[in-house]
Every structure is written in structure tokens, then in C-alpha cells.
Amino acid sequence: MEWCLLRTPRLMLVLVLWACGLTAPARAEEAARKFYAEDIKAAMMAHIAARADADGVFHLRDEKTGEELALKFVTIHDPVRVIDRNTYFACTDFAVVGAPEKLYDLDFWMNPQTGELKIYDEKIHKEPRKSLLYGWYKHPRYTFVKDRVVELY
């Protein structure tokens, strides 16, 4: 009986260490996974496809004006970026449905979740404005200082 009591804490310790050892490689593998430009772009395309309606229209509410925007994806800007080991970034252009000369520049932030990149934030970086001299251009709402958003107005 004494022998069993002495062995029980050791047995429990061994079982706990064994159980931790089974899950540790999975956590380490996820933390160690590196994502590259093609991974960031693939995550972006999957997000856009999931958010777009049957006609490929990406709907977004403008948080400054309250306007419901109907946009068509145009391109992902190069380069996409790794901000830190858990934050990835892509900048895109979307055209207003029915007015392809009016472009919105949308920014997307993503992080790794369950082994893949998922978008956790999106913002309108630049909005279409018209100049008598230059026509339509993208007017910035914010800029970046050391990878942080700084509002311009």
C-alpha cells in the first residue's frame, strides 16, 4: 500500500508531462509556421470570395459616412507585408460598381488562426475624390507611422 501511495504522485507527474508533450508540438508548429506573400494573397482572395455576393460584389459599410458601398475587387498591391510574427497586412483596390474609375483603397490585417491566416480588421485607407485637373484619385484618410494607423482627418 505504501508503495502505491509513493508512486501515485510520480505517475501523475509522468501522465501530465506526457499529455503536455502531446499538445506542445502542435502549438509549437502553429507558432513556428511562417506565412509568405502567396499565403497572404491566398487568404485575401478567400476572404474577398467569402464576403462577395453571387455577382462578385463586395459590400462594405463606410464607417466615416455610414454609406453602404458596393465594390468590385481590382487588385492586391505589392508588396504585402509581415508586420510582426502574428500580424500580416495587405492593401487592395476596389472599384465602385458601375463607376470603375472610382477606386477605394482598402487595407486588411490578418493573423494566424488554426494554421491559416484570417482577416481580423479592414479599413478604408483611401476614398475616391475628383479633381478638375487630374480626374479621379484616391484621397487618403490615414497614414502609417511605424506600422500604426495615424488618422489624417
Where are these regions (language model features)?
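Sec/Tat signal peptide C-region and signal peptidase I cleavage site
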Residues: 23-28
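Short, cysteine-centered beta-strand-loop-beta hairpins and adjacent loop/turn segments enriched
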Residues: 81-84, 95-107
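C-terminal partner/receptor-binding element of secreted or periplasmic proteins
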Residues: 30, 116-153
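N-terminal secretory signal peptides that target proteins for export/translocation
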Residues: 1-8
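A short, surface-exposed beta-strand/turn
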Residues: 100-125
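Bacterial N-terminal signal peptides
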Residues: 9-22
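N-terminal secretory signal peptides
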Residues: 29-85
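Short, hydrophobic/aromatic-rich segments at coil-to-beta transitions
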Residues: 85-91
